[in-house]
């Protein structure tokens, strides 16, 4: 990669802003190098790499997809470096003014009407982490039938911004970029 003229980066959709900003700065300092970012759900990108798509760098939001690529011998364990951290947050449309007050007797399922939106709980990293959190808190089962799974955090954010879901679980960095939640 050090001598490449083009560097193709596959990155989780949740990293769109960060990778775009970093790429611009890098290209300004290294005018002979072009960064070509490709953003999608980590699962989609990992499947593309497994099928033979070429990428110089892969930023996954989920270690499971990295491990899948190791098993398929598409990357080596020594190539993995944890670089970024994020956290899940609960969002709602700004006009909704939900005020969730956490306490020992808090009933999340009754705290809002309608749907909760997050990434697909079996494949999208944010959805997998949301499922773990909701399960740990004992909130998953009471919400069954009210959870909408999306293909990425950005899709979840869009659903909540439009009011199609009353609440959503996304990464903090994605929530902070929106003026509508």
Language model features: what each stretch is:
Residues 2-30, 34-53, 60-63, 67-73, ...:
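Exported/periplasmic ABC-transporter solute-binding proteins
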């Amino acid at each position: 990669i050090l001598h490449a003229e083009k560097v193709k980066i596959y990155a989780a959709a949740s990293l769109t802003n960060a990778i775009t900003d970093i790429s611009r700065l890098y290209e300004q300092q290294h005018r002979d190098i072009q960064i070509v970012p490709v953003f999608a759900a980590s699962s989609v990108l990992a499947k593309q790499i497994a099928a033979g798509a070429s990428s110089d760098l892969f930023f996954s939001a989920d270690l499971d997809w990295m491990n899948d690529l190791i098993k398929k011998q598409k990357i080596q364990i020594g190539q993995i470096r944890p670089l970024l951290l994020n956290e899940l947050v609960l969002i709602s449309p700004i006009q909704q003014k939900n005020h969730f007050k956490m306490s020992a007797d808090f009933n999340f399922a009754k705290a809002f009407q309608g749907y909760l939106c997050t990434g697909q709980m079996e494949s999208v990293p944010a959805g997998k982490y949301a499922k773990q959190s909701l399960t740990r808190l004992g909130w998953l089962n009471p919400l069954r039938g009210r959870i909408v799974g999306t293909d990425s955090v950005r899709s979840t954010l869009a659903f909540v911004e439009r009011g199609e879901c009353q609440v959503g679980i996304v990464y903090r960095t994605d929530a902070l970029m929106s003026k509508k939640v």
